[in-house]
Amino acid sequence: MITAETRIVALLGHPVSHSLSPRMQNAAFAARGLDWAYAAFDVEPDGFVAAVHGLAASRFAGANVTTPHKLAAAELADTDEPSVNTLVFADVGIRGYSTDAAILATLDQPSSPVILGDGGTAMAFKQALPEARVFARRGDWPPDVAGADLVVNATSERAEVLAGLGAGQTLIDLP
């Protein structure tokens, strides 16, 4: 049961009805015995700033941010990140973090990475991999991933990307 003491975390995106995050996060909160709740909110781009300020004023703990709001979240938050997927509401303002590229810490340093996409997630990987070749669906498509040892797919395209992969290439395929 949600009470006045319950800490609430939001997922902000457009669309978000398909997201499994609320089910996963609420199960994790329950397993840890936390009085926390997680809910998804479908927020259109023109309402994003108002939604974030409303959540902060309502004493939400924070929010996860997904498509198409990661760049706007970075502009609102106290951060140097170009793209933000996590907002923490604090007494002194809104702190922003990006966890998108954290998976890179588990891999060997790539020598020839390729990033597919030009949104917030792709920007987070571009900051972590400044030497990467970048392909966006608006221009350089289909992508040339030949010679890449790491392919980061930050698009909704799957079949074309998978068809272009060869032996020895690592794929990070993001939803």
Please provide the spans of the model-predicted regions:
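Short, conserved beta-strand edge motifs with alternating hydrophobic and charged residues
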Residues: 66, 115-116, 135-136, 152-155
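Glycine/Thr-rich phosphate-binding loops of Rossmann-like dinucleotide-binding domains
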Residues: 73, 124-125, 160-162
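Rossmann-like adenosine-cofactor binding region
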Residues: 140-175
